[in-house]
Amino acid sequence: MDTWTLLLVLHTSLLLPWAEGATPTLRFVAVGDWGGVPNAPFHTAREMANAKQIGKVVQMLGAHFILSLGDNFYFSGVQSVSDKRFQETFEDVFSDRSLQNVPWYVLAGNHDHIGNVSAQIAYSKVSKRWNFPSPFYRLRFRIPRTNVSVAIYMLDTVTLCGNSNDFLSQQPERPRNLELARTQLAWLKRHLADAKEDYVLVAGHYPVWSIAEHGPTHCLVKKLQPLLVKYGVTAYLCGHDHNLQYLQDENGVGYVLSGAGNFMDPSTQHQRSVPNGYLRFHYGAENSLGGFAYLEITPKEMTVTYMEASGKSLFKTRLPKRAKA
């Protein structure tokens, strides 16, 4: 873990051409639920449109990395490290020249857990772009040309809360391995308690808060949300619901839902399940090509821009640097 962290800090300290002379900024894309389909051509029009627009954004604005927020391969994950879906749904789709040297940092969703998550982890040794070192892990970065630091905690919310059957039950019922769930939560608590970074993000597949089809994840509202508040986390990033949402609680924690990489769902059926005033933005138009979130972190603030795959900017918000204790 320490070596992994060190390499990331070194990588993002390099000056990229589009960063010279501008405000020092760490830039990345967050996209979830982009995982194509299990039959030919193994991708959807929305996934292709998102890939093309992400390529354009990276070429024009730059990105140090891409966060994959789970459900990387619909509907049943992959079976082995040599599964053709890696090529057909990932490599051949996110193929723009601007994306060839941009690393992906990956976590698993509920559909990935139907297959072999260990194979997705092992694929890190095959692809120069795909980075998935373990089911849950920490990323640490520095904003280029500064000492301003960023930590991202990548979670496996399926092992934390259990799998969910999209067709039978909208809530994960219980983790399959209670000991592994406890280990992951203890790991997160320990690291958040010690986190000194200027920005701290947590990412997982299931949402804490959502007004859409799946609604708030009860397990995360109980176990994770209090930690986000207690330790001054900047934002929680997720997917699972197939739309774009931004919510913010009374403590200033942001909730960035970016699950529109492959499907779009207009549902707002859980609007009354979210506390009044939390929802700031929701977009799930059925005729949309989907979209993603683009994040820029400067020494002063973090900006989240929701972008449609058509190229339209939908919503923008800002979150401040963490207050020092």
Swiss-Prot record:
Keywords annotated in UniProt: Disulfide bond, Glycoprotein, Hydrolase, Iron, Lysosome, Signal
Enzyme Commission identifier(s): 3.1.3.2
Pfam families, per database record: Metallophos
GO biological process: one example: bone resorption
Catalytic activity: a phosphate monoester + H2O = an alcohol + phosphate
GO molecular function: acid phosphatase activity; ferric iron binding; ferrous iron binding
UniProt KW Disulfide bond keyword: yes
Top EC category: hydrolase
Alphabetized CDD domains for the sequence: MPP_ACP5 (cd07378)
Signal peptide feature range: 1-21
A single GO cellular-component term on record: lysosome
Listed SUPFAM superfamilies: Metallo-dependent phosphatases
Cofactor detail note: Binds 2 iron ions.
Cofactor: Fe cation
Subunit note: Exists either as monomer or, after proteolytic processing, as a dimer of two chains linked by disulfide bond(s).
Record's protein name: Tartrate-resistant acid phosphatase type 5
Gene that this polypeptide is encoded by: ACP5
